[in-house]
């Protein structure tokens, strides 16, 4: 089936978070991002969302660099020759080094359009089978431990299946001890966002007594070797996040023994197709995966739901309800969580309608690219 895209619209949005979100590398009060719309010759739209932040804390990509890459390189490549399947895009985009989040935003929009043209949900187009998915919640660093415990209590009461707590040096062992004392049976994990080095191995070993599901990305964001040295020293499984940017990174991590779990983020690895390839590799190796979050708005959240329907997404992901982050999301209906579960939508494409009124409200500026102008 030919995918005849006539034009692409890039929109720069800014949305206010309901509460500040703090990690070991910074605090977010607003989220800027690029919303990508691709429109075919029949006027059908597909939607994608860039997950890059406005500053290069998580990776080298930012909203501004993503816009530049999309405008100058990726959109022209999309229009450069006929397209029959979204899985062709990774090879087409391979001439552009890195810039995975920009690639994923455009590829995701094409996947949404492709599924709509087939008349099937995006999850089905990807090979997913689940009708509902288990989700957890990620909680940023709080002003005090009491504040953290209150936030956790609220989300446990709402039925979330897993609690993730951000840690950093000085906010780690004692904090996790207090959390575990207050919530002895809650599935719990810690996310370090690369805040430690191998010199901190004993401090990280001290977390073993708390029965954590995993510790996420304790060491450097580009490291596999030191994680392979650290993992045998810990009872707690290491989960890699920032270190895994491709199928090859995942293969090397598994070969080295750098981790026992992998967090898959669509934007970080360059798109849905690469995410699926990593999922399939981990399934073959018996390594569970889960879907991480990047403070996505509704479109990105919908893509996360779709990929999580693949069988080896065996652990609850970070795809919390829209209301966890936003007063008003950009999709209808908004993503809702009931007893720790999200029901997977069965409408074609991402399964949610984009609320153009809300998109307009949050849009700072936009630009349209027509096939004939870029071909």
UniProtKB/Swiss-Prot annotation:
Converts 2-succinyl-6-hydroxy-2,4-cyclohexadiene-1-carboxylate (SHCHC) to 2-succinylbenzoate (OSB). Also acts as a N-succinylamino acid racemase (NSAR) that catalyzes the racemization of various N-succinylamino acids, including N-succinyl-alanine and N-succinyl-phenylalanine. Can catalyze the racemization of a broad range of N-acylamino acids, including N-acetyl-methionine, N-acetyl-phenylalanine, N-carbamoyl-methionine, N-formyl-D-methionine, N-formyl-D-norleucine and N-carbamoyl-D-norleucine. Homotetramer. Belongs to the mandelate racemase/muconate lactonizing enzyme family. MenC type 2 subfamily. GO terms for biological process: menaquinone biosynthetic process. Optimum temperature is 55 degrees Celsius. PANTHER family: O-SUCCINYLBENZOATE SYNTHASE, O-SUCCINYLBENZOATE SYNTHASE-RELATED. Its cofactor is a divalent metal cation. Keywords: Isomerase, Lyase, Magnesium, Menaquinone biosynthesis, Metal-binding. This is o-succinylbenzoate synthase. Shows highest activity in vitro with Co(2+), Mn(2+) and Ni(2+). It catalyses: (1R,6R)-6-hydroxy-2-succinyl-cyclohexa-2,4-diene-1-carboxylate = 2-succinylbenzoate + H2O; N-acetyl-D-methionine = N-acetyl-L-methionine; N-acetyl-D-phenylalanine = N-acetyl-L-phenylalanine. Optimum pH is 8.0.
